[in-house]
Amino acid sequence: MVRLDALPPSLPVMTAAAAYLAKTYLYKAYHQDNADSHEVTSLSTEDLVKVVQYTDNAIMSAGGYGLESDFHNNFRPEPQYENGVESLWAMQYSMNDGTNNGNCNWSYGLIVPNIPGVTDGGCDFYKPSQNLVNAFRTDANGHPLLDSFNNADYNSQSDYADPRLFLTVGMPGFPYEFNKNYMMDQSTTWSRSNGLYGYYVTLKQNVDPDGDYLIKGAWWGSPMNRIVLRYSDVLLMRAEALIQLNDGRIAEAISLINEVRNRAKQSTAMIADYEMEYGVRFNIQPYTGSYSQADALKLLKFERRVELALESERFFDLVRWGEAAEVLNKFYAEEAADCTIYTNASFTKNKNEYLPIPFAQMSASNGNYTQNCGNC
C-alpha cells in the first residue's frame, strides 16, 4: 500500500481530488435545464452543501495548505517556489534533467512577447485587455470600483490600484518581469502587429529574460509549473457556495474573500520600489461591515476575476453564472476603442457558451446523444 501523504508533490492526492469535486459540484449547482438556452434556472442547495463539505473536511481542516505569503510566489520558476503551500496540484515541468529539454513547459512559448535583444519577434499571444487592467483600479477605501471601473482607463499617476495588477500584467512604462533592463514601451518593438492587439503582456506565465529559466531559441520554454488548482481558488469557491446558500454564513464568506485580499495587500516584494520609482499608488483593503447576499455575490465575482486573472477561469465562471453573453458583448463594444480586433466581435447567447458535441461522437451514439445549443 502506498501512503498518499508520502507521494511526491507532483502527483495529485486526496486534496486535489476534493478540490476537483468541489469545483464540479459548484458548476453542477447552477442548473441550466432549458434545452434551448443556457439560462440559470435554479440553484441546487444539495450541490452547494457539497462544495462547503469538500472544501472544509478534505482541504481546509486537513491542514498542510494555505495562501503563499506573496501572490507572486505562485508564478515563479525557481525550485523553492514550485509545489508550494498554495498549490494543490500542478502540471510538472523541469530542465537540466538529462533530456533534451523534453520536460520543459513549451505550452507558454507563444505567449512570450517581443523582448528587444532576446526574442526579437515573440508571438505575443494571450494579451491582457484594457478592461482587465481597469478592473484593478480601487477607490480611496482600497475597494474595487465594482460598477465604474471601466469608465476611465487606469492612470498610474493618479489612480489607486490593487498591487496584483503589477504582478499580473506587464505594462508600458514598467519593467518586464521586474527586470529594469527591459522597460516596456508602447511601440512596435514590444507589441505584435504594430499594437493591433494592444500593448499589455501577461506576467503570470512568463519569466525573467536574464534569469536561468528561459530556454531561448526558435521557441521559448521554461521549467515553470502550471498550477491547476490553488488554495485561493478553494477559498473563493467556498465563499461562493456560502453566499448562494444564504443560510446565515455570509460573514464567513466575506472573511474568506478578505483572506485573499489581505494576502494581496502584502504582495509587494517584487514591486517594493514601484510607488517611489514609478509613482503608482497601491491601495487594497479588506471589506468591513455586513453585506446582503446580492452585494456579497458581486464582491465574490469581482474577486475571482482579479485574483485568477489570466488563469483560464473567467470564461467558465461567466458561463456558470449565466452571464457570458451580457458581459462579453459589453466587453467587445467597449474594448474596440483600444483594440480594433474587437470591432466586429460578438457573442451569440445560447450558442457560444458551449462547443457542439463533435460530429464523430454524435454519429457513434446511434441516436442516443442530443446535440447541444453550441451547434444551433
Model-identified regions with their sequence ranges:
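Acidic/polar-rich alpha-helix caps and helix-coil junctions
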Residues: 1-106, 141-376
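Glycine/tryptophan-enriched, flexible segments
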Residues: 131, 137, 141-144
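Short, cationic low-complexity segments
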Residues: 108-135, 188-195
